[in-house]
């Protein structure tokens, strides 16, 4: 196999096949090429020729495993089919299918789904006289999962120290595990925990697996948890031909149980290991890498490395300060429009943010400008259930004959108007030739409708009519708050959410709707009305069905977490403020702040050529304008790599070219249709 196209560190990583090896693969350094070349090299060059079945390559997603296997077959031919490429969990499941009976489970076991797990957790809580209405079973399950990912068996789980949930978890975990076993089930985390127990407790199995897998490769090693590390050490046996490929600077999944110390302390787990550093970047311009290097260098707990590239020059990074989040979104949309006109394809542009809730203003501005986009790693803001419910209330208040919206919210929150009642009213509407709303107004006269149901329908009609009058008086956001309070929308949303975290996210989405209304009212002034707001949000069906210019290319919107492993010519990293980046929930412990810095590094290194880091000077939080402090990470950027653009500063002189171009283009927003230079077709948005 020709290794001449590999750089020296890459070649060293490929040909170092014996003994433990840590490959520190920086962002864009070609790690996938190194892994595939290394496997093929082992197949070709080892004395006597290694068999494909002696190689185990572990990835973190099934998609990555499939893609790697395809590359191997393309490079080495059919013999590469014998290489086992899979996730840790898939490997564990295969082990258990053969030998789980040795642990007392039936040979044909089931993997419990979330519903099964929660039912068993609640039963175990009741066994210990724990009120499953007072304590969230999902949180207990999360803590048990965390214990399993740390490699802790039930008898080893730490006892709670003053925290009720820790104590409950300590009590419930053993009962939960026994209940799983009694019904012949395992959970997802057991796919790591139980195989390790098999290898520890059964010497013949240990010998079987260590004899078969002579070469182990683990991709994305920085994302491993302790349960995976324990399994890997057992599989490595005495031969210890372990190649771990990863980047501690991209360790951003501690909330999933990933343990960055696995990569930082690799040599303590595998003494005498060698280390190869891949520092040449094939993705980004040097100016982008200079910024990334400067940010990540401030982390004390890391493997020292400095990314470099042959791609010198390039435009400086734009650090943009905007008056507020709406103007930040408008700036992003304008710059996207400008760069697309200069030839950058929409699918080579990404907007990154720390939390999903930040997408709303950007989505609105992209819709307004007719720029097609897709939201990755979560539903689009206006597709979220709680948001659609609020918007449906607006639609019914603005137009009671909107039957789809009416059916959506007539019993949301629950008010005793069930499906049977609505089916009967629908039948009467068809028979009388009137709208469903009109039929609801006649509910007292329908004999097949119980008096109680008719009364509930009447109360709902009165609610809608009353709020129609209130909305016509203006103050849209204020009236919406009053409506949501009266119907108990927040309480119902919180009660129906699967977890406390999910409830918080849903309520934040509701707050974003209110912020959107307030921004709309400020912008439109006396012209603001519920109907004009809805018209702005709505997409014309005909335009949705039209082909977006350039085929189906779309700008990508996603969290920084979701962007890992991806790359774009143009990247906008928005919300570069304290409490967002770094996130307010991660600023307490030093290790949390270090992870936020790594997250910032990941976001920066997604950019190949152009990078914008933007922030808002003011954000609306719970109906109030709050000043925002610039992210501390902006202070770490090298001055020579940065061009600052301040759109929020008071005007004291002539505007910069950047500002002049930005504000000059705002007039496009106010052009009447048909005046030329419009925004183009409305996007056909979709969820990925």
Q: What is each of the regions a protein language model found here?
A:
Residues 59, 75-76, 82, 235-257, ...:
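Conserved phosphoryl-transfer catalytic core
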Residues 62, 106, 123-126, 140, ...:
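Conserved coupling/interface region of RecA-like P-loop/ASCE motor cores
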Residues 88-91, 167-215, 225-231, 557, ...:
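Conserved helicase/translocase P-loop NTPase motor core
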Residues 29-35, 100, 271-274, 279-372, ...:
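Helicase P-loop NTPase motor core
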Residues 1-112, 183, 206-207, 261, ...:
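P-loop NTPase Walker
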Residues 17, 80-83, 101-190, 213, ...:
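ATP-hydrolysis module of ASCE/P-loop NTPase motor domains
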Residues 1, 640-688:
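Acidic, low-complexity intrinsically disordered tails
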